[in-house]
Amino acid sequence: MKSSESAAATASERRAETFQHKLEQFNPGIVWLDPQGHVSAFNDVALHILGPAGEQSLGVAQDHLFGIDVVQLHPEKSRDKLRFLLQSRDAGGCPVRSPPPVAMMINIPDRILMIKVSKMTGAAGTCGSCMIFYDVTDLTTEPSSQPAGASVPAPRRLFKIPVYRKSRVILIDLKDIVRFQGDGHYTTIVTKDERYLSNLSLADLELRLDSSVYLRVHRSHIVSLPYAVELVKLDESVNLVMDDAEQTQVPVSRSRTAQLKELLGVV
C-alpha cells in the first residue's frame, strides 16, 4: 500500500513540475499600480485581457483605463477578494513581502487567471504594487457545447482546478475531486486522500461543472455523484455519505433532495 501511495505522490509531483515548467514559459500579464491601487501601466498581455473587461463591464475605452481602480476591472463578486489581496501584508507584518497567488475567474472575457501581487518599495518606502497574472484558461477549461440558437455563450467547462500549495501552482484533475465545500470567498476541494484550498467560489464552479455529474446539494456543498456512497435520513434531514477519507456526511437541502434521488436512481 505504501509503495502505491508513494508512486501516486511521485506522479503528482511530476505533474506539478511539468505544469510549473509550462507556467514559466507563459508571457505574464503585468499591471503597475500606484499606492491607492490605481492603474499606472499595462503590458500588452494585460491590456489584451483586461481591456475588453473594462469596455464591456464599465463602458470605459482602453485608452481611458489608466488611473482607474484596478478592482473595478474585475467582476463585482471577485472585487472583495482582489481588494483583500491588494491590501494584504505578510503574516510577520512586512509590507513588502506579498501573499500567495489566487485563482480568479474573469467573465468578460471568460478567463481563469492566477494572480500574484507584489508590493514595490522605493527610497521613501512602499510606492505601489505590481500585479502579475497568468492566463491558465486553456490549461483548465474547454469550450462548452452551445445549444442551438443560444444568444449568450455558455461559460467554458472546467476539467482542472488551479490551486496554490507549497510555493507552487498545481492543477487538480476534476475526475479526482469527491466534493467541494464553500466557506465565504474560499472553497475546500476534497479528493479521496487530500484537501486543497481554492479561491474560486462555489458559484463560479457551479456554472462551469457538468450538472449531470456535479450537483450543488446545499448552499455550501457541491458533490461528485460517482463518489456518492449512501443517502442517510436523520429525522427531517437527509445527508449524503461521500467516499472521501472521512466518509463525510454532506447535508442535502430539502429543495435538492428529489433531484438528488432521481440522479442516483433512488426511489
From Swiss-Prot:
Gene (UniProt): rcoM2
Sequence ranges assigned to domain HTH LytTR-type in this UniProt record: 161-266
General remark: This protein undergoes a ligand switch upon reduction; the heme distal ligand is coordinated by a Cys residue in the inactive Fe(3+) (ferric) form, by Met-104 in the inactive Fe(2+) (ferrous) form, and by CO in the CO-bound active form.
Function in brief: One-component, b-type heme-containing aerobic sensor and transcriptional regulator that responds to CO by activating the expression of the oxidation operon cox.
Organism: Paraburkholderia xenovorans (strain LB400)
Positions that bind heme: H74, M104
Cofactor note: Binds 1 heme group per subunit.
Protein's name according to its UniProt entry: Heme-containing CO-sensing transcriptional regulator RcoM 2
Top-level taxon: Bacteria
Top-level taxonomy: Bacteria, Pseudomonadati, Pseudomonadota, Betaproteobacteria, Burkholderiales
Keyword Nucleotide-binding belongs to the record: no
Molecular-function GO terms, alphabetical: DNA binding; metal ion binding; phosphorelay response regulator activity
SUPFAM superfamilies, per database record: PYP-like sensor domain (PAS domain)
Any one Gene Ontology cellular component term annotated for this protein: cytoplasm
InterPro entries linked: LytR-like, LytTR_DNA-bd_dom, PAS-like_dom_sf
SMART domains: LytTR
The UniProt record lists the keyword Cytoplasm: yes
